[in-house]
Amino acid sequence: RISERYGLGREFGKTVLGEKLRRKIGLVSAALQQKLYPEDSAFEIVLSGAFASIGLYESPSQSVREKAVALLEEFGSIRYADRRYETLSQGEKQKVLIARALMADPELLILDEPVTGLDFIAREQVLDTVEQIAKKDSAPSMLYVTHHAEEILPAFSQTLLLKKGEVFALGKTREMMSGEVLSEFFDMPVQAVWTEDRPYLSKKKTANLNV
């Protein structure tokens, strides 16, 4: 359990400092985006990830700067590295946040609804970035939070379904994203169709028994 007020938590039965946890966990979320300084450049935002800080208060070493450049190049974001964060599109902002989250080589990367509000092209570009990370041998464990099944990439082998704040089901993604399980989950007939190893849901039509 984490105490945001005191920056303390419990890890493996021991009390740890919030900063220690922050360096082990990379986070991409709407809440984090709102805390960032909009006048900072994309490059500065990414650099701040090395220090788990909001804003840049330390002078980054050459190796840290080179790593930030490498991540921006890898995600196709280097062309707007010097632009103010507030001027970026939502999709560009998300890719910058992902690069920021990877600066400290986290053991866990949490992606909390990273493509919410994006159009189709921007959504797929961000998802391509996520898949690109997952394919690396050095990839961190990833926790992807979403309300939309079509965002579930082949890289996510396990799926946990939450309903009213409680665990409804946990298992292999193929099993969880089945019409049978999801019909019970949504309390309505659901059909799941897999395309390119991703599930797409629709309401299953039932025969009209009225005469």
Protein language model features and the residues they cover:
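Catalytic Walker B motif of ABC-type/P-loop ATPase nucleotide-binding domains
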Residues: 109-113
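Conserved catalytic motifs of ABC-family nucleotide-binding domains
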Residues: 105
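Helix N-cap at the start of a conserved alpha-helix in ABC-type nucleotide-binding domains
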Residues: 120-122
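Conserved ABC ATPase "signature" region
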Residues: 47, 62-80
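Conserved ABC ATPase signature
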Residues: 84-88
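ABC ATPase nucleotide-binding domains
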Residues: 185-211
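H-loop (His-switch) and adjacent beta-strand-loop-beta switch element
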Residues: 159-172
